Amino acid sequence: MRVSVSLVLGVGLGCSSPALWAETESPAELEVLTVTAEAERAEGPVQGYRANRSASATRTDTRIEDIPQAISVVPRQVLDDLDSARIERALDFAGGVSRQNNFGGLTMFEYNVRGFTTSEFYRDGFSANRGYMNAPDSATIERVEILKGPASSLYGRGDPGGTVNLVTKKPQAERFARLHASAGSWDRYRSTLDLNTPLDEEGDLLYRMNLAVEDSKGFRDYADGQRLLVAPSFSWQLDPDTSLLVEAEVVRNRQVFDRGTVAPHNHLGSLPRSRFFGEPDDGKIDNNNETLQATLRHHLNEQWSLRLASHYKHGHLDGYASENSSLAADGYTLRREYRYRDFEWHDSITQLDLLGDLHTGSIRHQLLMGLEYERYHNDELILRSIPSRNPYAIDIRRPVYGQPKPPFGRDDRNHEEVDAMALNLQDQIEFNEKWRGLLGVRFDRYRQDMNATRLNNGRFRDTSSQQTQRAATPRIGVLYQATPEVGLFANASKSFKPNGGTDMAGKAFDPEEGRGYEAGVKLDLLDGRLGMTLAAFHLKKKNVLTADPSNPGYQQTAGEARSQGFDLQFSGQLTEQLRLIGAYAYIDAEVTKDENIARGSRLLNVPKHSGSLMGVYEFREGWLHGADAGAAVNYVGERAGDSSDSGFELPAYTTVDLLAHYPLASNATLGVNVNNLFDRRYYERSYNNVWVAPGEPRNLTMSLTLNY
């Protein structure tokens, strides 16, 4: 698939033709994206950097200052200022979120919140990471919300550190079009189009289309990729009490699979950041995803309403890759494994919520009673060579490409089916102007069937396992509004996550269980222009899978881990012209029990200290009127580079980015972004010493934005 920036440019110019936009006002009079704080909705746009409402923490439209739990919101404006194509960059400003395995650069397969790694993230409250979905594209995202602490009482299976929920762009009442085209270092080209229009005079029928086209060679040798995204959405106000929203997204992604660089003898920095250890003639991995989502809302009366929503996604991934396997004793001979993957998955989720808003005497209750059903199918085929038999080696100092492909010696075929049902109960309680509480519980029933066929050394081995797990995950929280500017809160909650597979006796493993405790303060500063949340936390997780010392080759649920610390996040307007967003986290995360890893070992990719700050200044006078300029600083401390307590570490780093925008006309803006200004050599993440992802060198992006 070869995609061209001219495709979206052509569509954008066509959509801006006088015939199509004959009914619009002049561009100078259209201020369509300005949204006041009073009009903000939990799923809508945010003015500036500070969000006031969220639905991620309660599945209801609630003021953030009334939620007795830490939640960070990174709004669309941050993504626009950074000119970021992926949402991972936004997570740097959430506080306590770090990067983990990205599956060769293809996905947001895993990330880390408050010390614990998770593969769960959500899209409008639906699980979005079943299978191997492409890394989320920023073109469709209105805001990125990070709920800190266990979220199983709302979302079901997950990890105790926290959860990311992506809120997508919805059709708006105003008519507008935004065309954005950028070009940058390493022949990186990207164009997006955001087109919104009412379809009738009354504004009951609204339509929005988001398009993105991307073509990039990247700073890594031979590791280029292309992406095409089409995301239409449609809303219909059927009557004053009933609305329907339908959203779809189609993504076509082709990218070279890249496990990154290596660390000879556990030392980094001796190799060029650009050096690639795969094979240029392997081709690209194709990852095609389709998502369809529909939400029907109906107000029964002034107190009660219904929400029925369904979400379906499908994905297919296939392609060849030569991947880093292990380093020989000499430290420069890299054994490699040649793989072919063919994965396909389907996931469907349906939710039915009954929401109530009523009083018992002087006490207000916002009630949520919800049912959820999910069915998931996943089929995986992996063919791989065997490095111990065919090393397929390459010299990391002077790589010579074009070796004959080794034969496949192992054939893995896996089939997984999951049926999950859940009941949610929640009560948001407003006792008076000072005190608020939150009670919630979720009852989950999870059934998993797995079948695996493995051909190894010419012999087939078939295995199957089945497990049914039930879990009740409660949550309780309280908030005291000491003054209009200061709110104190505390909460406790539980999480669970099923463990796949069976032990030596063929018995399904007990699920991982997590507990979280949090206390903090929420501040409303500078007459409401700046919001801040400071929270301390203590998290535990048990039933972590670890090797069974009595039965080599098998596992048992004997592992435990603990994470504790505090994090800070703030955002808003320091002055009318200066917007800020920033975060800091101190995280002490370690293994507390394991059969193979020493107690006290640090958890993978978790820095003890991390922080970020971005500020943008808007000019209001003179020849710079309408322009802005800003900078972003990101610090990440030392991290364990693998999970085996080998002593391999990723060094700390600090990066500085610059940005500026200048209005060429009333509807045209020129932008420039310089990332990693001082060209620091750094490493974003690793899995071990042969899977290490280097960060981007200094790079420049120029952009042009047209608004109609």
UniProtKB/Swiss-Prot annotation:
CDD domains to which the protein is assigned, alphabetical: ligand_gated_channel
InterPro entries from the UniProt entry: Plug_dom, Plug_dom_sf, TonB-dep_rcpt-like, TonB-dep_rcpt_b-brl, TonB_rcpt_b-brl_sf, TonB_sidphr_rcpt
Signal peptide interval: 1-21
Pfam family for this entry, one: Plug
Topological category with respect to the lipid bilayer: Multi-pass membrane protein
GO biological process: nickel cation transport; zinc ion transport
Subcellular location, record wording: Cell outer membrane
Knocked-out gene: effects: Deletion mutant does not show growth defect in LB medium, but it exhibits an evident growth defect after treatment with airway mucus secretions (AMS). Disruption of the gene alters the intracellular zinc content in VB-MM medium supplemented with zinc. Mutation severely affect the ability of P.aeruginosa to cause acute lung and systemic infections in C57BL/6 mice. Mutant shows a small decrease in the extracellular content of pseudopaline and is partially impaired in nickel accumulation.
Gene3D superfamilies: TonB-dependent receptor, beta-barrel domain (2.40.170.20), TonB-dependent receptor, plug domain (2.170.130.10)
Induction remark: Is part of the operon cntOLMI that is negatively regulated by zinc level through the Zur repressor, which leads to transcriptional activation of this operon under zinc depletion.
Superkingdom of origin: Bacteria
Keyword Zinc in annotation: yes
UniProt keywords, alphabetically: Cell outer membrane, Ion transport, Membrane, Nickel, Nickel transport, Receptor, Signal, TonB box, Transmembrane, Transmembrane beta strand, Transport, Zinc, Zinc transport
Residues annotated as domain TBDR beta-barrel: 174-708
Family annotation (SUPFAM superfamilies): Porins (SSF56935)
Gene Ontology MF terms in the entry: siderophore uptake transmembrane transporter activity; signaling receptor activity
TBDR plug domain segment(s): 63-169
UniProt key word Mitochondrion: no
Gene Ontology cellular component terms for the protein in this record: cell outer membrane
Assigned protein family: Belongs to the TonB-dependent receptor family.
Summary of the function given for this chain in its UniProt record: Transports the metallophore pseudopaline, which is involved in the acquisition of nickel and zinc, and thus enables bacterial growth inside the host, where metal access is limited. Is probably involved in the import of pseudopaline-metal complexes.
UniProt protein name: Metal-pseudopaline receptor CntO
Origin species: Pseudomonas aeruginosa (strain UCBPP-PA14)
